[in-house]
């Protein structure tokens, strides 16, 4: 007969009327019993013949999470001008005195951040914007382009102008300044207009990427043409003192970007940009492509690899840099839905490209992308605004895989020890936290996003029957992209974007100037940054407990009034460092802090309400006696694992699920196992703060017997059959807890000390977790353990009782990093009377 839930509870000693623990508990370690129970609960039966279930409630397989929904009315969020102060270390030192080595090291890591992977795969521009929403392709294209444009305007992206130069907006950092003979050259325009950048004599690098003109002149003279364009390009550049035009006409092939169908990086797009000539040909030369492509009349990239002189000549005489969008103006409408109708709506469509306020030299950057982008809802509660998702997953997979640095995250017990107190709390919202941390420009070639321009994007999506030959763009191809769909979409978008439609229909390549979210390095850097800042804040304001996890910063103080005054001072301090806070999103929590998915109060820690609701929903939807795909089990275990520390039996209760995931088999919930888990998760117990104290109870065991020292009493017992040593030690610890009720137990076994009971026989692990819940362990070397003799059957010999102090752990967070001493000649900082008479120390 299958095991009933009541019987199972009794077996696990979860009921009060169980027999003496010393007899009952060792039985749970018996392998035979564990096997029988597993068979009864159908836990071991992994090879099932009925089809697997692939969806349970909201949980689907690990990689097929809910499909994002496109919202045609998404608004692009605005980004403040974020500029983290470069001398952040000095500013902190003026405020707090000398920083510790740890803080300095962390702050130097992000000033600037560096990312140089050994290998980078370059993808064609077509893959720049992911076709996530096929039915809203055009709308998604423009919204994404607008988002990228907003980021560029906010100084978060560089725009690739030529192979070796980029432009950006916002305040420059010193590593972006003029290094004339080094690798970087930087120059600021006097006026920020779009067309005003031609005649400056000082500059090294003009904002107009006229490399192509000069290069084409050299190329054509080799093809036997008159170097007619040369005079144009040289016109204004005579005055500029240091032109280093590194053009080697003989060694380099002409520039050209491969048709984007192929995914290889084109090594010929090499140093076109290094002709750094000032030029006056900017207005005529719409080199809207910030790459070294030339546009032919149809707007498709023309390759200039091996072109016979005649065609090169016709190319040079015609409108070289013609623009796909503006060409519709002169062509006959092909139908009612021809784009000509839209292009004729406006007389002035604005420039083909915009240029940043500053220019900078960069390492050779191909006209390619290294990751794709798409839009999703900003968060589950805010679906009106969009968020850009950047997929640089190439750096986490395959041959281009980078191993990211690891960083410490406080575990639940450390977090509770730190934050469970009677303080009042508030949390600060750092707006666009990732975009605070600057990236070195030399990392730009590895983090490229962009798009191939509207015609290519549309052509790629609709490339069903028509095979568009990109190499030879001709006039007839111009109308190939006209369609009712595109026409209607563009008309609607015209209301939103107006003449920007023209700008956004051009190709563009952007590199990150601040760290993007889609790279594994970013969370590490953000964690280093905020933890260093909080460490400084804790020292500057000794009455304040500041703590952070990623971009979530919380402040705690003894009274609400004090918290408010601290809030003002700390906000001003953070603003002076260039950290942008969002004052509307500051949350005041009172005495129970919501942080990292937990509610933390003076009573301890529990999961937040929305997680409790998810648990209830999960158990409501959980099918019984149906094999569930192990990928779905991963999702279920993810949720249950988060709340496991708050249940009686903890993680050991989930071991059968873990085992099936590990063996990649389906899992079938029997009614009893489901009822057991359900009951476990419906009553959650808080994880309490550990208290420091003196250890007076000790446990020890040998494979055959156990011994306890409780104060001056000694006890011993034997096991019916010899047990593995770790199991014996765990049993001894359980006996010590149940006999003495002590919350502090000394043991010499590292596995018991770690409080991870998942490797023990399943039933024993579950029961021991419940018995030892809330117990803290202290390590006692075997030689000093007073329970060592009784465990070997010797009761007469007394070892002196140790005075072993226990200090609760706060993980790797050192709350009080003492500042290095200040040299004596500095005057003392003024100390105003504090609202508290004593500096608050952690509980």
From Swiss-Prot:
Q: What is any Pfam family matched here?
A: DNA_pol_viral_C
**Swiss-Prot/TrEMBL keywords:** DNA replication, DNA-binding, DNA-directed DNA polymerase, Endonuclease, Host-virus interaction, Hydrolase, Inhibition of host innate immune response by virus, Inhibition of host RLR pathway by virus, Magnesium, Metal-binding, Multifunctional enzyme, Nuclease, Nucleotidyltransferase, RNA-directed DNA polymerase, Transferase, Viral immunoevasion
**Which SUPFAM superfamilies has this protein been placed in?**
DNA/RNA polymerases
What residues bind Mg(2+), as annotated?
A: 429, 551-552
Gene Ontology annotations of biological process type: DNA replication; symbiont-mediated suppression of host innate immune response
Q: What is this protein called?
A: Protein P
- Organism expressing this protein natively: Hepatitis B virus genotype C subtype ayr (isolate Human/Japan/Okamoto/-)
Sequence segments annotated as region (Spacer): 178-346
- Which residues does the annotation list for site: Priming of reverse-transcription by covalently linking the first nucleotide of the (-)DNA? 63
